């Protein structure tokens, strides 16, 4: 069997649905999802293997303005993902399609040698007139004549058709992952990211953007898995918010993450502690983008 392989960068503005598409194709959640922008902080790799063809997706952070440490890292991480990829998949949010990031990413992608595919996502929600408006903008303003894929992970509409197109563009070459390996993330980091997701879903305002997660101890070889995760925060006030009155909020976060991890791995234990990190900026550099 002659192997085929393709490296595909999934790009788009924050909260466009990039992680949802990747999780849909993997049929499991490796890239966390929330309604807040900038949930994805690093490039997350996920691989889908169909017969002789392997597609390795790079789920990138949403395009961010260069404000602060996070903004600079997110933008750098996104641009780095476009180097040496075979295909760029631009995800346009049908509910807010004309963001600055959408246009910038389209222009950047057109300057590369990669194939460019465009999907308008969340198409189960806007009016048809909005979809026509997006198509007109791509054709008239961006001279984009190729087919536009309409997708929704909520209704599973168009996602397989788009995946088939991506697979068809793969060229002959060795696979990058073993057939049974579907991500570059280790189990302990997947678990830690699930905890971070629950913080995003449970805590509002600026707090979720001022935390980092770190797996500290784990055992996946016993009958019941054990994972300890440290939630690092910038300030004592953030720590108090996450812990909540009588520890209720932290218990809620831990219970929600544990329930999802048990559905993924079976019975196990998750322990979460919250720590104020006096070297927070240095820690997040080391954890998320030291490379």
What residue ranges belong to the model's regions?
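Conserved C-terminal guanine-recognition region of P-loop GTPase G domains, centered on the G4
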Residues: 49-54, 73-146, 219-224
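P-loop NTP-binding site
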Residues: 187-291
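Canonical P-loop GTPase G-domain recognition
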Residues: 114-115, 124-186
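Active-site glycine-centered loops adjacent to acidic/histidine catalytic or metal-binding residues
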Residues: 59, 121, 152
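Conserved glycine(s) of the Walker
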Residues: 17, 158, 249
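Conserved, well-folded catalytic cores of nucleic-acid-processing
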Residues: 28, 47, 51, 81, ...
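Catalytic P-loop NTPase motifs of RecA-like helicase/translocase cores
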Residues: 40, 64-65, 97-98, 126-127, ...
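Conserved G1/Walker A P-loop phosphate-binding module
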Residues: 1-83, 232
């Amino acid at each position: 069997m002659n192997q085929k392989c393709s490296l595909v960068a999934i790009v788009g503005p924050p909260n466009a649905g990039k992680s949802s598409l990747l999780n849909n194709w993997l049929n499991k959640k490796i890239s966390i999802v929330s309604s807040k922008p900038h949930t994805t902080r690093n490039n997350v790799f996920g691989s889908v293997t169909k017969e002789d063809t392997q597609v390795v997706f790079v789920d990138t952070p949403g395009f961010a303005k260069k404000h602060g440490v996070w903004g600079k890292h997110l933008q750098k991480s996104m641009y780095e993902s476009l180097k040496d990829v075979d295909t760029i998949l631009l995800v346009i949010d049908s509910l807010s399609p004309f963001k600055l990031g959408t246009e910038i990413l389209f222009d950047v992608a057109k300057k590369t040698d990669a194939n460019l595919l465009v999907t308008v996502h969340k198409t189960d929600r806007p009016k048809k007139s909005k979809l026509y408006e997006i198509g007109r903008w791509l054709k008239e303003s961006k001279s984009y004549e190729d087919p536009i894929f309409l997708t929704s992970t909520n209704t599973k509409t168009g996602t397989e058709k788009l995946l088939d197109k991506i697979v068809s563009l793969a060229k002959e070459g060795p696979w990058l992952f073993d057939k049974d390996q579907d991500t570059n993330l280790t189990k302990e980091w997947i678990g830690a990211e699930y905890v971070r997701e629950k913080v995003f879903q449970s805590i509002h305002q600026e707090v979720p953007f001022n935390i980092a997660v770190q797996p500290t101890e784990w055992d996946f070889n016993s009958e019941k898995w054990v994972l300890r995760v440290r939630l690092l925060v910038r300030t004592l006030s953030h720590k108090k918010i996450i812990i909540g009155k009588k520890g209720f909020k932290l218990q809620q976060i831990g219970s929600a993450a544990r329930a999802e991890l048990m559905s993924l791995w079976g019975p196990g234990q998750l322990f979460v502690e919250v720590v104020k990190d006096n070297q927070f900026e240095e820690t997040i550099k080391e954890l998320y983008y030291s490379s």
